Amino acid sequence: MSEKRVEKKLIHYVKKALNDYRMINTGDRVMVCLSGGKDSYTLLSLLNSIRIEGNYKFDIFAFVLDQSQPGWDDSALRGWLDDKKIPYEILTRDTYSIVKEKIPAGKTYCSLCSRLRRGIIYRYAEEQGFSKIALGHHRDDLIQTLLMSVFYNGQIRSMPPKLLSDNKRHVLIRPLAYCQERDIIKYAMEQQFPLIPCNLCDSQKNLMRQRVKRLISDLAKENPKVPSNMLRALSNIKPSQLMDHELWNFRELNVD
C-alpha cells in the first residue's frame, strides 16, 4: 500500500470515529498526549492534517511528559513539532524514580506509571483549560484490553472511544479506535517520526499484553475476522445473555 493510501485509510477511520462518537466539537481545544511513540505521533499528525483541511474547527496542542527516564532525548521531537508549527509544552516530572522504587524487580511497571502520568495529564489539562484530551490507543489496544480484563481481572471492559473521567472534569477521546496497528506502523515508518523509546515498557517484553497480542494474532491466522469481530463485540452487548444483576433483573424474570 502506497504512502498516500495508508494515510488516506487512517484519516478515513479517524474521521469515522470522530463522527460516530462526536469526539470533537467546534471550538474545542484538544490536548494531544504525545509520548514519543508511533501511536501518539500518528494521532497528532492525522488530527493536525484534519484540522488543516478546515472541515473540523478546533485547536490542537501537544503535551509531552518527560518522566526523567534514562536516555530521554526530546531534541528531535521538538524539531518535528516546530517544523509542523504545532504548539506544545514539554513538562518534566520524575515519575521514573517513583516507579522504580515502588515496584519490585520483575513486576509490571505499567499500572503505577499510568496512574502517575494520568494525574499529571489531568491537572495540566484543567489548569490550561483544554476541553478534550486525545490519547493514541488504537483498535488493537482496545481488543487486547478486553481480553486482558477478562483473563486477569474477571471483568468485561476495555478502552471506550470517548470517556468522561471519574472526577467528571475531563473528556478523553481515542480517535484511532478504528485504526489497525499494522497501518500505524506503516505510516510511522513512512513519516519517519523521531521516536523516543520507553525504557520502562521496552524493558518488559514478556508482559500480559504481549501474550494476549500473540493469542489474537494466532487466532487471526485461522480466521482473519477475529480482530474486527472482537471490536464489533464491544458495541454489540447483550446484557440478558450475561450474568450481571446490575444490568439485567434476573431474579424477577418470569413468564407473564
From Swiss-Prot:
This is tRNA-cytidine(32) 2-sulfurtransferase. One of its GO terms (molecular function) is sulfurtransferase activity. It catalyses: cytidine(32) in tRNA + S-sulfanyl-L-cysteinyl-[cysteine desulfurase] + AH2 + ATP = 2-thiocytidine(32) in tRNA + L-cysteinyl-[cysteine desulfurase] + A + AMP + diphosphate + H(+). Homodimer. Its EC number is 2.8.1.-. One of its GO terms (cellular component) is cytosol. Catalyzes the ATP-dependent 2-thiolation of cytidine in position 32 of tRNA, to form 2-thiocytidine (s(2)C32). The sulfur atoms are provided by the cysteine/cysteine desulfurase (IscS) system. It comes from the Bacteria. The gene is ttcA. [4Fe-4S] cluster binds at residues 110, 113, 201. Belongs to the TtcA family. Keywords: 4Fe-4S, ATP-binding, Cytoplasm, Iron, Iron-sulfur, Magnesium, Metal-binding, Nucleotide-binding, RNA-binding, Transferase, tRNA processing, tRNA-binding. GO terms for biological process: tRNA thio-modification. The thiolation reaction likely consists of two steps: a first activation step by ATP to form an adenylated intermediate of the target base of tRNA, and a second nucleophilic substitution step of the sulfur (S) atom supplied by the hydrosulfide attached to the Fe-S cluster. A motif (PP-loop motif) lies at residues 35-40. CDD domains: TtcA-like (cd24138). Its cofactor is Mg(2+); [4Fe-4S] cluster. SUPFAM superfamilies: Adenine nucleotide alpha hydrolases-like. It comes from Coxiella burnetii (strain RSA 493 / Nine Mile phase I).
